[in-house]
Amino acid sequence: MFDDQDEIHPLLAGAPQTTEFRKLRKRIVREVREAIETYGMVERGARWLVCLSGGKDSYTLLAVLHELKWRGLLPVDLLACNLDQGQPGFPATVLPEFLSRMGVPHRIEYQDTYSIVMDKIPQGRTYCALCSRLRRGNLYRIAREEGCSAVVLGHHRDDILETFFMNLFHGGRLATMPPKLVNEDGDLFVYRPLAFVAEADCEKFARDMAYPIIPCDLCGSQEGLQRQQVKQILDGWEARSPGRRQVMFRALMNARPSHLLDPGLFDFLGLATAPRAAEERQDEPPHLRGEA
């Protein structure tokens, strides 16, 4: 796709000059391009709001998108955005300093959603669901203010698999986070270009690049017990059968409504055998007609 000796975007400057890292980088870039092309995420001249939390996944997303744009392979404008939600101990200067140093256009927004969550959620319960909803609403608002057509999130393959099994085990439905959707108001796309990328690859990429990672548990809340349990199940399957995660992920791209049970997806009532004139069967010998 490109020569490793070519000039690269500052976000990838200082990348380890090892064969292992070059393979990792090329794999992630290839998988992001594949997701973008498979789900039709690109509208030439569009503007994307790329959400940056300061975690390994969003750093990986930001770097790869800027690398593609740098090489003329992604014809959109990119605006990085971090929403400072007022969590105690949040290092407010880390991201703006990093983005400025890298020459990345960005917007840092302060909205104290932390206080709202603490007021609404009883002690001992996980804050993640309400926190996520409040964050998403603010990101949609910012996208509109900045003239963006899409909000771009850093969910990867493992997030998508975990959400599928959480819905299966606890929600009684076959559903997950799609790589592309339209928000409820119908005015913004939501994209997940890391949909084909493994979490382990994001973690290694961000670690090797020494990006300034900000922990996601500053509020003191941990991931919900249900997601932790699903992670453990998937980890166990992967340990016993390496490659199992990728097989399961491919299944999400290979649904057969006629082999499921949802009459809303397949017209079982209208199902009929292929028409065959009775006269044609009369020409068959009795033993073929089941009469012998």
Curated annotation (Swiss-Prot):
Cofactor note: Binds 1 [4Fe-4S] cluster per subunit. The cluster is chelated by three Cys residues, the fourth Fe has a free coordination site that may bind a sulfur atom transferred from the persulfide of IscS.
Pathway, per record: tRNA modification
Cofactor: Mg(2+); [4Fe-4S] cluster
Catalytic reaction list: cytidine(32) in tRNA + S-sulfanyl-L-cysteinyl-[cysteine desulfurase] + AH2 + ATP = 2-thiocytidine(32) in tRNA + L-cysteinyl-[cysteine desulfurase] + A + AMP + diphosphate + H(+)
One Pfam family named in its UniProt record: ATP_bind_3
Short sequence motif PP-loop motif: positions: 53-58
Cross-referenced PANTHER family: AMINOTRAN_5 DOMAIN-CONTAINING PROTEIN, SULFURTRANSFERASE-RELATED
Record's keyword annotation contains Protein biosynthesis: no
UniProt KW keywords: 4Fe-4S, ATP-binding, Cytoplasm, Iron, Iron-sulfur, Magnesium, Metal-binding, Nucleotide-binding, RNA-binding, Transferase, tRNA processing, tRNA-binding
Other notes: The thiolation reaction likely consists of two steps: a first activation step by ATP to form an adenylated intermediate of the target base of tRNA, and a second nucleophilic substitution step of the sulfur (S) atom supplied by the hydrosulfide attached to the Fe-S cluster.
Cellular localization per UniProt: Cytoplasm
CDD domains: TtcA-like (cd24138)
Function (record text): Catalyzes the ATP-dependent 2-thiolation of cytidine in position 32 of tRNA, to form 2-thiocytidine (s(2)C32). The sulfur atoms are provided by the cysteine/cysteine desulfurase (IscS) system.
Matches recorded under InterPro entries: Rossmann-like_a/b/a_fold (IPR014729), TilS/TtcA_N (IPR011063), tRNA_Cyd_32_2_STrfase (IPR012089), tRNA_thiolation_TtcA_Ctu1 (IPR035107)
Full protein name: tRNA-cytidine(32) 2-sulfurtransferase
Enzyme class label: transferase
GO biological process, one term: tRNA thio-modification
